[in-house]
Amino acid sequence: MSNDPSVLYAARKLYKEYRLQGISVPVLKGVDLEIRRGEILSIVGLSGVGKSTLLNILGLLDSPTRGGLAYWGRDEEFHGRDVAALDINDKSRLRNRDFGFVFQFYHLLPDLNVLENVLLPAMILRSVKAFRANKALLTDRASELLRRVGILERRDFPPNRLSGGERQRAAIARSLMNDPELVFCDEPTGNLDTVTGHRIHELILELNGELGTGFVVVTHDRGLARLAHRTLSMRDGLFMNHHN
């Protein structure tokens, strides 16, 4: 879909419709989008305009009604293929290896400590045998990520002993566990106070600069949007403008 080597991911003419009591409800109405390698891209707009739906499709958590996705990540196996049309196993493999996710309400498992939560993506990506064989190295990586996000001293705590900001830091560390190309963030500061939210802004900027990881951030937070390399505004299922 793109001849530009700076483009990592592209969506072309994405449509998404839901059936509600027998009526077709359009949410996305032909979205075109290119995501560049290593950029922070924010997507803003009112509730219900299709931001989270688009994020779920880009993250291969949902499928479009029509349209395609092209991805030029580290694995050439998927180059030139419509990754929206992959079977469930290939989608899962690509998603777990190349994408990370951060949500508004953290989604940390309460029965695991912070370190174990961060290790989860590595467990999912590997067989039990492979995980056990590499557990020491993977644990070192998880600990290093917790150090980077500033909560290494909380590694043995259960999530319910963390503040909201600390839980989101743990979720960000978890999203980076498999060294993803892209992290998709759905309202990452929406459940935080202003000061804590600003610290999360700074952390995303820092991680992007240090690791080169790309971030796609759906947000109502104009402060977070202003820190992005680009901001796109959605209205009625389409992008309205581009700010570079």
Predicted regions and their residues:
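ABC-family P-loop ATPase nucleotide-binding domain
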Residues: 1-17, 241-244
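ABC family nucleotide-binding domain
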Residues: 8-227, 231-234
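H-loop (His-switch) and adjacent beta-strand-loop-beta switch element
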Residues: 231-243
